Amino acid sequence: MDQDGEKRVRAKQSDDEVDWLRDLPESLLCHILLNLPTKDVVKTSVLSSKWRNLWRLVPGLDLDSSDFTENNTFVSFIDRFMSFHSDLYLKKFKLRFFCNLNGDEVSENAHIARWINDVVKRKVHNLDLTWGAVEIPPILYLCNSLVSLKLCGVTLPNLELTSLPCVKVIVLEWVKFANDLALEMLISGCLVLESLTLCRRPNDNVKILRVSSQSLLRFSYNGSSYKGLHDDLVLEINAPKLKILKLFSHQLTTSFIRNTSSSIVEADINIGLGKKFDPKDLPKRNVICNFLAGISSVKNLFIAPCTLEVIYDYSRCEPLPLFCNLSYLSVDFYNNSWEILPIFLESCPNLKSLVVGSITSPKRRTSVLSGPRRLLSSLEYVEIESPLTGEVFEMKLVSYLLENSPILKKLTINLDDSSRKKAECELLTIPRRSTSCQVVVL
């Protein structure tokens, strides 16, 4: 086929694609465009006459101030969009702004108040607002149509009344609260709330953080990474239906997990002490005790090295609670010895699967395994994801698992190419307590 013929075929194929797209109903096109940033939606206006004004009918706005050369243009565009078909319901309203508008806080609050009032009237479903140091007007917290609320960098006022009967998802990142009660009031008005994510900022005005919800299924908490800022924080969780819990904090604060322990299925814990463990610090020991009891019924557990070290330090003073429901455990080791792992494993009588992520050479040596250990009588599957190089501490881990797991079915390990032959030879010398264990080398 000559070049002209190929061009005609490609042109015909292109026309067919355009015709197919052109034949789609307007409502479906708007639904597709709703998933794109508004700057890309506007670009479709040059496709054809049918598309010229279609972007105005899309029931959502998704704007980033960085796409505009001037702040005033950004504000004007939002105002223009809101003026189009003012009777149109909004499914999504998403704004991201990372600097002050001419440094005028009064103007910023006025803009936000105007837009929030408008989207509430237009029955908005999903609101996602990233803005600095503005206060969200109270009318938002009486929005009957809102399903998802995400706020970043703003200030949550002291709420006298909250009614968000349809909200299922809340994400609050670097939000400043008027006081301890602001978050409590917000949550209390969300009777069908299923997912709550909190990413805290320094000096957010909260000392006692209470999360109380009869409907909450997933809770993710990310405390401030600044040392010492939340030392005296009280975190209280009262969620009888909670299934998934994720906690990340520089240090374990005064925590209470009640009415949740029997419901939690999965927990991802990354919490350290923030300072050297003191066995004589009875209040801190009680905090650790209550915390471990609160998560002791989980089935799947992802645990960070710092948290495992907290557990080990506590175990030297008090017996650990039994994690009888735990069947899956994932752990990492960064600069601390894996030899603290068996202490925790012996509190998991029904553990079936163990995944070991990263393993690095420990900064300090321990003698935890100097004596005989209990058998891992329920362990069936182990995977070591980090490539092994044949180091002594790595082979000790493999030996411990193979020699103490009587029903182990499969051990999967990764070997570093540079030392594969050496590691393979060492593996062959390690005895296995389980005669049916399959060692898979990747």
Curated annotation (Swiss-Prot):
F-box domain sequence ranges: 18-64
Lineage, opening ranks: Eukaryota, Viridiplantae, Streptophyta, Embryophyta, Tracheophyta
Residues in FBD domain copies: 363-415
Name the UniProt record assigns to this protein: FBD-associated F-box protein At1g66310
Residue runs in coiled coils: none
InterPro entries: F-box-like_dom_sf, F-box_AtFBL13-like, F-box_dom, FBD, FBL13/AtMIF1-like, LRR_dom_sf, LRR_FXL15/At3g58940/PEG3-like
SUPFAM superfamilies: F-box domain (SSF81383), RNI-like (SSF52047)
